[in-house]
Amino acid sequence: MYTQRLLRPVSQASRFSLGPWSRAAIASRQISNYTGKAFTLNTGAQIPAIGCGTFQDKEQQEGAVLEALKAGVRLIDTARVKRKQKVANAEYSYDTEPFIGAAIQKSSIPRNEIFLTTKLWCNSFHPEDVESALEDSLRDLQTDYVDLFMLHYPCTFARGEDRFPKSEDGLMRMGETTYVDTWKALQEIMKRTGKIKAIGVSNFSQDEVENLIAAGMPPAVHQMEVHPFLSQKTFTTWHKTRGIHVQQFSPLGNMNSFYREVSWSNGRANRGRLLDEPVLHEIGAKYNKTPAQVALAWGVNHGRSVIPKSTIPWQIRQNVESVFVLDLEDVEKIDALNADLRFNTPDEAYRWPLYKGLDGV
């Protein structure tokens, strides 16, 4: 299905295959939990190395997810953020769960062959609201369970239908409970209902993750912004020591136009685009791969799953072909692109000190 065992050493002839990993990976032990096209989570489940992100362009997501599934993608990531909102001068919307549910149904691919992720949005963090929010997602996704249910951010917003509740002065209204309360509720729901196979987080700091571990269970996955401009080496290495899988969102950095539009990041995002970096072109020529494929492979070679977002069929097909071995010197060349450039920084808008103590803050 997703997995294959690694049995033989790398040869020049096998360089472009999905199979055995290079001396870079073996020497660094960075992908010891890798089994071909998937990683093993601390739950024992397998998460595919390459997925499909679905942020924005909701009307195109049904076709895009169908194309991705047809191309072999088996990891689909979405979220509960609903309605198009103007946040910091840019349109912020997922609202894609119904389209993804329809695509999965039309694909005829057995549900147990798809790793489906969605997220709990911040206005549903009160423990009394978590299960109903999960049921809303399951209904729209047309499924009985999700493989991974994540806290989208550590901040809690005021309860209610409004996803971005604001006071008369325009400031976000904050909730009365904490993300730790929500985490405990998730654990209970997962154990009682079986409708969640694993729980995880997105956009948390190290201190915040440690608080979750102290609350009874480490996340299975931490989805965070990681790309060659923001490698977060110390933080991602820390996750390995805790058995928490790191998943990269925005694995192509500032290629997403959202970052060039939103006021909180456009100063940084409008620098040179990641895929214009000469080193990615040089390495791509060596392996007969595109710069995007090289950037994605860099993440996988470091032991992380990646969820690039595209609605363009040829790009989706190329993304699937991004699981290949990079030589050690090429991994190090891409590592050297790090500039601690973080593009997703809604701290002020969300009234929360996001990413405290991390690179790029």
Predicted features and spans:
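Structural motif corresponding to the early beta-alpha repeats
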Residues: 115-128, 150-156
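Short amphipathic alpha-helices and their capping/turn segments at secondary-structure boundaries
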Residues: 105, 130-149, 233-241
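N-terminal binding-site loop/beta-alpha segment at the start of enzyme catalytic domains
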Residues: 2-114, 131, 252-256, 350, ...
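Short, acidic/polar
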Residues: 58-69, 126-141, 205-209
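Active-site mouth loops of central-metabolism enzymes
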Residues: 48-59, 120-127, 171-175
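Beta/alpha (TIM)-barrel catalytic core signal, keyed to glycine-rich beta->alpha loops juxtaposed to Asp/Glu
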Residues: 122, 153-361
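Alpha-helical scaffolding within the catalytic cores
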Residues: 33-39, 101-104, 134, 206-209, ...
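Hydrophobic faces of well-ordered beta-strands that scaffold small-molecule active sites
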Residues: 48-53, 76, 88, 114-118, ...
